[in-house]
């Protein structure tokens, strides 16, 4: 990479020409090493956004961030992640975080990668901190929790320290950039299975292609009528990576055996408000809409990990598991273990 030339990259982008995966990787490696001037970074992020980021550019950036991440002792068993880009602006309850604990209670190994809020009042780490989870637990400690409890949480800033170099530019630009889609792609444990929500339908196919380039086994990329998760208020568009191919289809609440509910029925609040709501959901005491919103996302995770034959069966499994209260117990146990 000694021939790396930042001005060539800039000129290429100014001409609306896409970068190769290698060029993108070389550039973002320098970003997370603190070697890129903020003005240059601002120009590149803006040019990429106006042109529209390609799968190759996103893959290169993801590979750069994964290469620079703090290592995680990766297990040799299969495990999964459920995560959204955020940025849908709707401020719903923490569906993917709640779903992670239900899925773990159903027997999946879930390595949840997350950070602070992007668009909601409460990101995954904000919520888990409200439950008493120590976000700074070591990688070894997190791995032990994955082994023993079926679940762990990896706090993105702890594993991607180099992202701090981009933070001032991202804050100043106040707009979505390639970084918004990178978060769900850079779990340092590198799961082979993932349910990933995106904030715009045009991201579905490119992000599925990125997962393929990153060597994932099976992934569902979803956009639920404005939500970065599977929706109850309308259709959910899906791009699924399966057996090395990407297939596109649409899901409705009927496919999961549940009713339609308005999106207003799953709006959340700040972390302390969301904590109360999630506490209810994880023991089957939430509203019908709240229980269903979590159940359909758990169902998709169960199907893509081979733990349910179809979405209706997966939804039934998830709803039944919440009624046992086991998912809440799991969350409390993880919080206790993280403080040791």
Curated annotation (Swiss-Prot):
Reaction(s) catalysed (UniProt annotation): N-(5-phospho-beta-D-ribosyl)anthranilate + diphosphate = 5-phospho-alpha-D-ribose 1-diphosphate + anthranilate
Binding locations of Mg(2+) 2: 228-229
Pathway: Amino-acid biosynthesis; L-tryptophan biosynthesis; L-tryptophan from chorismate: step 2/5
Cofactor note: Binds 2 magnesium ions per monomer.
Entry keywords, A to Z: Amino-acid biosynthesis, Aromatic amino acid biosynthesis, Glycosyltransferase, Magnesium, Metal-binding, Transferase, Tryptophan biosynthesis
EC number assigned by the record: 2.4.2.18
Zinc-finger as UniProt keyword: no
GO CC terms of this entry: cytosol
EC class of the enzyme, as a word: transferase
Similarity comment: Belongs to the anthranilate phosphoribosyltransferase family.
Listed NCBIfam families: trpD (TIGR01245)
Listed PANTHER family: ANTHRANILATE PHOSPHORIBOSYLTRANSFERASE
UniProt-recorded name of the protein: Anthranilate phosphoribosyltransferase
């Amino acid at each position: 990479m000694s021939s790396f030339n930042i001005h060539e990259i800039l000129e290429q982008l100014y001409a609306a020409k896409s970068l190769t995966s290698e060029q993108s990787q070389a550039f973002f490696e320098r970003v997370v090493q603190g070697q890129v001037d903020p003005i240059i970074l601002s120009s590149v992020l803006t040019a990429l956004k106006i042109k529209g980021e390609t799968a190759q550019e996103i893959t290169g950036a993801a590979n750069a961030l994964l290469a620079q991440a703090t290592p995680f002792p990766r297990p040799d068993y299969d495990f999964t992640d459920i995560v959204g880009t955020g940025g849908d602006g709707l401020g719903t309850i923490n569906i993917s975080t709640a779903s992670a604990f239900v899925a773990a209670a159903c027997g999946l190994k879930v390595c949840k990668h997350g950070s602070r809020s992007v668009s909601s009042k409460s990101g995954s780490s904000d919520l888990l901190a409200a439950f008493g989870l120590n976000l700074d637990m070591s990688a070894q400690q997190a791995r032990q929790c994955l082994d023993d409890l079926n679940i762990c949480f990896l706090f993105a800033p702890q594993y991607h320290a180099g992202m701090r170099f981009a933070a001032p530019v991202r804050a100043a630009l106040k707009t979505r950039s390639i970084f918004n889609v990178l978060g769900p792609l850079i779990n340092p444990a590198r799961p082979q299975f993932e349910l990933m929500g995106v904030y715009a339908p045009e991201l579905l196919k490119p992000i599925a292609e990125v997962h393929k380039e990153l060597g994932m086994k099976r992934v569902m990329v979803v956009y639920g009528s404005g939500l970065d998760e599977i929706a109850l208020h309308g259709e959910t568009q899906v791009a699924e990576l399966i057996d090395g191919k990407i297939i596109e289809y649409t899901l409705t609440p009927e496919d999961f055996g549940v009713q339609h509910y308005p999106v207003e029925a799953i709006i959340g609040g700040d972390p302390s408000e969301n904590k109360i709501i999630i506490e209810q959901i994880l023991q089957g005491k939430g509203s019908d809409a709240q229980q269903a919103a979590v159940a359909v996302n758990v169902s998709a995770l169960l199907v893509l990990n081979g733990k349910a034959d179809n979405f209706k069966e997966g939804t039934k499994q998830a709803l039944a598991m919440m009624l046992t209260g086991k998912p809440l117990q799991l969350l409390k146990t993880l919080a206790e273990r993280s403080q040791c």
